[in-house]
Amino acid sequence: NQTEIKMMFDDKNLYVGIKVPAKSNNFIIPSLRRDFRASGNDNITLLFDTFNDGSNAFFFGTNPAGVKREALLSGGGTDLRGFNLAWDTKWVCKTQILDDAYIAEIAIPLTAFKFREGETKWRFNSYQFDTQDNEQNTWMNIPQNQYIFSLAYMGEMIFEKPLGKSRAPIAIIPYINTFSGNDFENNSSVNDVKFGGDAKFAIGNSMNLDVTINPDFSQVEVDQQITNLTRFEISLPERRQFFIENSDLFGDFGNSRDGNPFFSRRIGIAKNKNGESIENGIVAGARLSGKLNNNLRLGILSVQTEEDIANEIPATNNSVVAIQQKLFSRSNISFLFINKQATKDYNFLTREDKYNRVIGIDYNLASANNTWNGRYFIHKSFSPTVNRKDIS
């Protein structure tokens, strides 16, 4: 028996009905946590390449218990690095377990996607893990030497009428945070009110302008606790919403392990005069990112952090410009410029800490059928004390 997937859409939502046959209702569901790992349990995943570029896709999945997983997929699905599971959006998924199958009914708001106005075709694929038959099934055939989520092998999804605009033009999320405390030992009290907010503006159908003022990240999901017994830093995923969308445009340069020039998690953290990492508040930030056309992507980011004189931390501006041009069927060439610079000349600043800049070019190779893929890059760092050999 084959898995059945049927779709409908209106001006607001994409509706998906799925029936997954099975030998019995003895499904393996090891976790009810959102964004669960697909391997080793029963589940089905849908991939939508809304710009038909074979490089980026939206990813939605569920298991027989109705647990949801969604992600942004970049880099053409050539490796696991392209998954961004920190991205979340609102959508509905209900499931029912039968004796010989499970059924899923899904409604995804069209505002969750980005696409060109008037679009009539997306690229689509789905894959399913079946533990009872120990199988991995896909709608479009994918060679066994490729990842099951490869965007090189996708079918066409045709809409009966052209789609409208992909996003609401403006989204504003304000916040206010109050704090009150008493120090009975010193007979004093502390009262504090903090306010700020985030705003997202749609520019056309494929560009976003994100703005943040005095951001409050208290609602961000807590990081997984890891005991680090090595002398090396742990690289934890970015979970702050301001930095997530199109994050691959800024952070997918160099080598993810030892040659990545920009890691957004460092913004908002600084070392005090004792060399300890502490929180460094963000005053404001702006971020423009998306597609200028089907072949050219642009990202501009600027974030200002506050000064902390007591801990000898300067006010710093963090700026990034990234440009990505598509080449051939699925390859691209990217340009990156990073500038981190103290906004004033502080007495406690050493010469090497006044600024640091990086300029770089990356070429990401991905053939049409993903037989050939690779990465070539050269990056150069500039600071007051850097010599000519600081190249990666």
Which ranges hold each PLM region?
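Structural preference for beta-rich elements and adjacent junctions enriched in aromatics
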Residues: 1-326, 331-335
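Feature marks short, surface-exposed loop/turn motifs that line or immediately flank catalytic pockets
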Residues: 217, 341, 382
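Solvent-exposed loop segments that connect transmembrane elements
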Residues: 310, 345-349
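Exposed, low-structure sequence patches enriched in small/polar residues
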Residues: 281-283, 289, 354-356, 367-392
